[in-house]
């Protein structure tokens, strides 16, 4: 059980879209999947926030420039339309919490506010996706 919790936690650092299916495949209880994914994802964005400006340089080296620009444009449209609140909540679902935090640091003036709203987005979407995934498995 501890091994499964650790696996879901560490995968949660990489993003919520990856750890929820892994937890469901390992037949873990949805509450534990949700808790460990939330803790892991929040730790992941905290690390990104603390490393700050070096993140964009890292992404531009290792990812295709067009991929970053496409995600930045999508993120910028989201930010212009909904502000930091919408960016944190909807960006978490659309492009994942790590990319939202990393790219959001380049356009948001207050990283702590972005961290807060991205954390809220992580809690909302992890809970929703875990419940829907569990519900889908229990139907079949």
Describe each region flagged by the PLM.
Residues 4, 10-22, 93-102:
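Transmembrane helix boundary and interhelical junction motifs in multipass membrane proteins
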Residues 8-13, 37-43, 118-123:
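Transmembrane helix-bundle signature of multi-pass membrane transporters/permeases
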Residues 31-38, 109-120:
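Membrane-interface alpha-helices at helix entry/exit sites of multi-pass transporters
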Residues 84, 98-102, 115:
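Short amphipathic alpha-helical segments
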């Amino acid at each position: 059980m501890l091994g499964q919790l650790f696996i879901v936690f560490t995968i949660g650092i990489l993003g919520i879209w990856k750890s929820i299916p892994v937890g469901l495949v390992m037949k873990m209880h949805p509450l534990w999947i949700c808790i460990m994914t939330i803790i892991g994802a929040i730790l992941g964005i905290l690390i990104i926030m603390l490393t700050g400006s070096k993140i964009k340089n890292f992404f531009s080296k290792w990812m295709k420039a067009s991929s970053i620009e496409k995600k930045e444009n999508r993120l910028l449209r989201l930010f212009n339309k909904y502000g930091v609140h919408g960016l944190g909540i909807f960006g978490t679902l659309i492009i994942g919490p790590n990319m939202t935090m990393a790219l959001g640091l380049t356009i948001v003036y207050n990283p702590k506010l972005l961290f807060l709203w991205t954390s809220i987005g992580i809690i909302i979407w992890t809970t929703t996706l875990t419940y829907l995934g569990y519900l889908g498995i229990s139907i079949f």
